[in-house]
């Protein structure tokens, strides 16, 4: 999971992992 990368982009990792 690229939660860290998404956090930097400002996108909630919840939406990405969903």
Swiss-Prot record:
Keyword Calcium among UniProt keywords: no
Similarity annotation: Belongs to the arthropod PDH family.
Residue stretches in coiled coil: none
Pfam name, any one: Pigment_DH
Gene Ontology MF term list: hormone activity
Functional summary from the UniProt entry: Causes the migration of the distal retinal pigment into the proximal end of the pigment chromatophore cells and thus decreases the amount of light entering the retinulas. May also function as a neurotransmitter and/or neuromodulator.
Keywords: Amidation, Hormone, Neurotransmitter, Secreted
Source taxon at top rank: Eukaryota
Sites of Alanine amide modification: 18
Cell compartments where the protein resides: Secreted
Keyword Signal: no
Protein's recorded name: Pigment-dispersing hormone
Any one of the GO CC terms: extracellular region
Gene Ontology terms: biological process: chemical synaptic transmission; response to light stimulus
